[in-house]
């Protein structure tokens, strides 16, 4: 912790390509709304994939107190990976397509409100998961959502509408697969449309794939969605956006420390 009478250094890392919102006003808004009595401010724009990770890692090595990811969940993941087990705190100004990390933690959507939130915030410790040796902070998945996320990441357009378009295109050609799921308490075979492992409760846009996931319990919430018929899509979407995904007959839920 930084003594109360000492200013904290804070670096805003802006991803200009995330989401659909314009970020040209970020420097002006930071200058206008940040608490300059608390923070010494620096701002940097990322220039390529992985750049946020590099800049955040350098910042932590140089003793910067707070690094703020200005972007979506991909930017948060890059910055967060660089800051795990360091003395540098992660802040977020959510400007992505879904902003699942920020929404889960109650961070306001909107640059001005998010800056004001940072002005009054104190650091807390949160969990992260690991897959293939890489940390993740919201969720990781296998199946349909992984296919859509991969296709969305490869595209140049962002926003919820484009995500829905990608989903519809992939829906037509996707075939569910069979998985062997093993945890500390079970091992079972599932034919699944999606297997989602949630550290956070939602994908973003308040789509709750793991409604009761917590970032502070040391556990992963797993939702296994079995194949379903096309006419059931509206009901599945309703469950997803009304915090009742676990109540669907097509969903098996697990809570585990590893999978």
Named regions from a protein language model:
Residues 1-67, 187:
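ATP/NTP phosphate-donor binding region
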Residues 13, 37, 61, 85-89, ...:
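Catalytic core of DAGKc-family lipid kinases
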Residues 23, 183, 189, 214, ...:
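ATP/nucleoside-binding phosphotransfer catalytic cores, i.e., glycine-rich phosphate-binding loops
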Residues 69-73:
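N-terminal glycine-rich "phosphate-gripper" loop used for MgATP/nucleotide binding
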Residues 74-88:
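Short Gly/Thr/Asp-enriched flexible loops that form oxyanion-binding sites at enzyme active sites
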Residues 141, 145, 196-210:
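Glycine-rich phosphate/pyrophosphate-binding beta-alpha loops
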Residues 157-162, 211-231:
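Gly/Ser/Thr-rich active-site loops/lids in small-molecule metabolic enzymes
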């Amino acid at each position: 912790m930084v003594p109360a009478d000492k200013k904290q250094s804070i670096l805003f890392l802006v991803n200009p390509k995330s989401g659909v919102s314009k970020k040209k006003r970020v420097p002006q808004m930071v200058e206008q709304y940040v608490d300059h009595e608390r923070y010494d401010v620096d701002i940097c724009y990322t220039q390529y994939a992985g750049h946020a990770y590099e800049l955040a890692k350098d910042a932590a090595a140089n003793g910067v107190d707070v690094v703020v990811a200005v972007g979506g969940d991909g930017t948060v993941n890059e910055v967060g990976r660089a800051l795990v087990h360091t003395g540098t705190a992660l802040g977020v100004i959510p400007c992505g397509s879904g902003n699942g990390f920020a929404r889960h933690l109650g961070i306001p959507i909107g640059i001005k409100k998010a800056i004001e939130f940072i002005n009054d915030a104190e650091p807390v410790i949160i969990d992260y998961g690991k897959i293939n040796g890489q940390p993740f902070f919201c969720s990781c998945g296998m199946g349909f959502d992984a296919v859509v996320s991969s296709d969305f990441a490869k595209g140049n357009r962002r926003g919820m509408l484009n995500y829905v378009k990608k989903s519809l295109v992939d829906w037509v050609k996707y075939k569910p697969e069979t998985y062997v799921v093993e945890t500390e308490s079970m091992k079972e075979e599932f034919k699944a449309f999606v297997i989602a492992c949630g550290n956070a409760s939602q994908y973003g846009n308040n789509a709750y794939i793991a409604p009761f996931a917590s970032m502070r319990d040391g556990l992963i919430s797993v939702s296994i969605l079995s194949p379903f018929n096309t006419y059931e899509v509206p009901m599945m979407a309703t469950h997803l956006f009304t915090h009742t995904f676990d109540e669907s007959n097509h969903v098996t839920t697990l809570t585990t420390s590893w999978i």
